[in-house]
């Protein structure tokens, strides 16, 4: 067949030219880098591998919400880099178990426990508290920080409130039980005050190194338990200062050999002037404006390292200790410069360098560690490696406040992680953190946690509704439903939200915006479901399943879901070997359908008793098992299996509150009874007898039993007589009251 004329002009047929779509520019992950104070494109040094060092805790007390602020936030960042952006993250964290705070706390705890075991007499305790109070008053007068001063004043007032009752009980010769009770109260209230005094007096005599390892070992264990409870991933490598002393000594030696350190009186200091004047280096990269801040520098050196003799060892006030010569009462290790221990800043440099080498991608820590700790880390490490890029990206988590107030261990207003987990679940705490920027201040308050709880409920209800829709019976082909405009619109919104979430994660891992986009997607999905149900139509199963699986996967990436469930939060805890929902739900579905059939017959026959039983099953019995039936007119009952642990926890909380009220009431009644008994015992003493038993104070008395001479036979001064007369007159009144009570028959 002959070709048409037009076709003949084209010659041999070929494919037309093709050009790719213009598309959009792909976003790249940017992180806020403290080294530039700007968001920078994140580019690891070695392909997709990311080396990361995180400053761990100084383990001398319970982990608090300030710790949670850093470690949950870094856990979220780590998971997102690993599981969303698909980086190969190698994460190293340290444990500081050699530190001035640990040494001081260990000595104080040890000496106080020894003091308690020795069981001082009430008189001796009163005398010791008096002596310790003098030292404490000096400490108070030298304190300029208003918050810390307020805390010290509270301690002082508490001690005085406990001191006077014991003194009065001893003077009045109250029953031994009452004196013992007052003795224990004063001992407990004066613990901080006595510990300081005992440390100043006997601290240098604590020489057993093993004593200094017990405290950090215990608190490290508690820290790891807290992190596990918060679902914080363990580090790939954990380094302890006590296990890296040889590496630290070698690290310090090389810094000295490179000309950036000097030995002074057995200690080794970093020469900030020499380092800063080098063309290859810069000192205080993170907070250059803080150079010369002696208060911050001294806090970095530690309480045991800022005495006048220590400070005189430095060439410059800005220099800091790499190695500290140990004094009596401090743990020590051998070194080329004599017995000593590592400085705080050098510990991280040596351990991070040992594991990650001369340059790492990310270094993380709390905002308050920027200067001097991290600036000094940078200086030491770059002096050791003779480079200018020890850390490529420095990430600092924001502060944590408690209901708008500063949180500090020294102020004793911190909430421990265990305390927080008594009130809220690990997921709720994590959601609260996700709802805030990782680098900004987070206010831990009832409002913050209520927002997290409501978000969790909002998401969970959506997941439960979708699961109910997916359980509706259908054949194989029935799962593929025709798409109308509503499905097309929801699907478009779904992909728009996914794109917005990606943009937010690329923008300094903005989880706050991500959660809002997820909330918006759920709201759109809920509107779609409601519209379908209103029209008596079945929502598109596959579309809702895709949306739910995506949201679940994002929450898994954030560490808010641990289970392998495809959709939603796990039911019945996170460590179940079986899937409770898939096992139980078929039976609940049968029960629901049977109940609906019974209700239908009861309505037709107007059997109200059966309807009441049906409602009782829904409202009273099934909630006890963590099951919720939701009845909708004209539609099948929605069956939801909720977390049983949550219900049990709510009950336990209510029970605890009731028990606490009962305990306080009983305690108040007991105290009142004891006070009345003590008062009655005091009232029974005739005024002419009250001083006669005090032979250790007085030798002569007048006809009324009033003392006139002391034990040495000297007449009492007018001042002494005036003071005793007041006590005598007070006792006269009390005794008269007692006699009146006897007369009235009301005294026992």
From Swiss-Prot:
Residues that, per the record, bind L-cysteine: 56, 96, 373
CDD domains, per the entry: CysRS_core (cd00672)
Catalytic activity: tRNA(Cys) + L-cysteine + ATP = L-cysteinyl-tRNA(Cys) + AMP + diphosphate
Localization per Swiss-Prot or TrEMBL: Cytoplasm
Residue ranges with Basic and acidic residues bias: 656-679, 686-717
Chain positions of motif 'KMSKS' region: 406-410
Disulfide pairings: none
Its EC number(s): 6.1.1.16
BP-aspect Gene Ontology terms: cysteinyl-tRNA aminoacylation
Protein name, per record: Cysteine--tRNA ligase, cytoplasmic
Intervals of motif 'HIGH' region: 57-67
Function of the molecule: Catalyzes the ATP-dependent ligation of cysteine to tRNA(Cys).
UniProt keywords, alphabetically: Aminoacyl-tRNA synthetase, ATP-binding, Cytoplasm, Ligase, Metal-binding, Nucleotide-binding, Protein biosynthesis, Zinc
Subunit and interaction comment: Homodimer.
Residues reported to bind ATP: 409
Family designation: Belongs to the class-I aminoacyl-tRNA synthetase family.
Cofactor: Zn(2+)
GO molecular-function term, one example from the UniProt record: metal ion binding
Residues binding Zn(2+): 55, 348, 373, 377
HAMAP family for the chain: Cys_tRNA_synth
Motif extent ('KIIK' region): 101-104
Cofactor note: Binds 1 zinc ion per subunit.
Organism annotation: Gallus gallus (Chicken)
Spans annotated as Disordered: 1-25, 656-719
Keyword set includes Aminoacyl-tRNA synthetase: yes
Pfam families: tRNA-synt_1e
Principal subcellular localisation of the protein: cytoplasm
